[in-house]
């Protein structure tokens, strides 16, 4: 039986808890060659999660590995390419994986639950809210939810593609404070330390848009995610106000050290007299001081946006797959920024075939004074500024674009709304003016580098 990692003297119960999401890839918990679960890592993850719970925090684990464990259970050497075989192995492996998690957590008397999601569960607003409410209720009950994509039901066209993206959505859904993306690297560097002895680790990334992610950096033979997907996940999570951390998966105990350090650092840097009522990170660390906390191991943290996009607006931006594009002029964009709806007069063109209440991209383009050689009243390619749920489908918007709202009924024979999209159904991307982060590189265990 594992030793109880809880230390009553360090318990922070009674303080406002933080919500910590830990994402584990297949390569972190399943041996790439033998396909055996790496029990030593699983055990350390369990001890880390329970330690966080004893510190008063709430924990969610997003765990891959079902297919990898299924390969071992059925003595299959290589990951198959056919979807039906992958789905079958996922069904087999998920049972075994959850059995392992439950057995390990049971030693420390920590209840867990299983949540399996597909992209369709996220794109449907009612199911999204149901999943959100279930997760929040489980956290209130002191349960650790273990989340995975439902690979048995998901098909290629609607898969998340990797659990990095899923973990970011879960973190946003739960209003988490931290998302830990566990990987085979310690952190980001300002240059490749293998070729530049003066390379320095990057502790904080403020402007994630300045990072050039090498999406060609593939995952392991068992997994689907590489470094590019982690940068995408960090972008999603930080936009929802979640501090995102990349750190080494083989040392999960680092999570506790990093959380405690960041808690103490936040408290230390808070101006005297600041109200802690609005800052759970400060409230949860009343008993910590910066001097008393061990300096954390190497990691890179991506800072959250100061004005996060949450709940319905996050769901519109990141939970839905867009079915088309609406090209708008600068005046329409200014109106949207000013909290007005999207009027047809500001619509220049439409692309794609979408229906009423489906999601579309909003792209700002330059309006021409007269049609160009291509017959268009605009020139692009333009800049995507957000997403919207539309009140009219493609055929209707093509007919009413450029017209005043009072003309809609005359043109269509009816007028469901004066707006192409109501303002509450528009979610705009935020453009942050933040310090530029230098070109970053990630170094993996084998010594290779990945430009980020």
Segments (PLM) and residue ranges:
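C-terminal catalytic "cap/lid" subdomain
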Residues: 2-452
């Amino acid at each position: 039986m594992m030793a109880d990692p809880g230390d009553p003297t360090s318990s922070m119960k009674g303080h406002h808890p933080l919500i910590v999401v830990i994402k584990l890839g297949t390569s972190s918990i399943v041996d790439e060659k033998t396909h055996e679960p790496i029990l030593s890592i699983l055990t350390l993850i369990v001890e880390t999660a329970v330690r966080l719970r004893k510190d008063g925090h709430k924990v969610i684990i997003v765990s891959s590995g079902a297919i990898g464990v299924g390969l071992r259970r059925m003595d299959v050497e290589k990951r198959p390419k056919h979807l039906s075989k992958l789905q079958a192995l996922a069904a087999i492996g998920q049972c075994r994986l959850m059995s392992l998690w439950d057995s390990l957590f049971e030693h420390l008397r920590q209840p867990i639950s299983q949540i399996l999601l597909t992209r369709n569960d996220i794109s449907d607003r009612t199911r999204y809210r149901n999943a959100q409410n279930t997760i929040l209720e489980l956290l209130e009950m002191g349960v650790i939810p273990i989340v995975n994509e439902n690979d048995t039901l998901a098909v290629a066209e609607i898969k998340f593609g990797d659990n990095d993206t899923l973990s970011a959505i879960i973190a946003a859904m739960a209003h988490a404070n931290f998302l830990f993306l566990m990987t085979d690297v310690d952190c980001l560097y300002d240059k490749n330390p293998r070729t530049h002895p003066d390379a320095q680790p990057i502790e904080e990334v403020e402007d994630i848009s300045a990072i050039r992610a090498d999406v060609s950096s593939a995952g392991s033979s068992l997994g689907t995610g590489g470094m590019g997907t982690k940068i995408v996940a960090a972008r999603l999570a930080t936009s929802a106000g979640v501090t995102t951390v990349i750190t080494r998966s083989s040392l999960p105990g680092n999570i506790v050290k990093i959380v405690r350090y960041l808690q103490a650092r936040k408290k230390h840097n808070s101006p005297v007299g600041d109200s802690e009522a609005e800052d759970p990170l400060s409230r949860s660390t009343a008993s910590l001081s910066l001097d008393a906390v061990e300096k954390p191991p190497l990691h890179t943290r991506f800072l959250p946006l100061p004005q996060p996009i949450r709940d319905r607006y996050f769901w519109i931006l990141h939970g839905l797959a867009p079915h088309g594009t609406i090209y708008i002029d600068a005046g329409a964009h200014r109106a949207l920024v000013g909290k007005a709806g999207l009027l047809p007069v500001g619509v220049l063109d439409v692309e794609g075939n979408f229906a009423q209440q489906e999601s579309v991209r909003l792209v700002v383009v330059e309006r021409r004074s007269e049609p160009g050689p291509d017959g268009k009243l605009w020139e692009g390619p333009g800049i995507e500024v957000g997403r919207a749920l539309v009140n009219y489908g493609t055929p209707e918007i093509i007919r009413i674009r450029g017209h005043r709202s009072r003309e809609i009924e005359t043109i269509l024979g009816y007028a469901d709304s004066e707006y192409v999209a109501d303002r509450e159904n528009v979610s705009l991307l935020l453009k942050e003016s933040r310090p530029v982060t230098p070109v970053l590189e990630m170094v993996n265990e084998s010594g290779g580098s990945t430009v980020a």
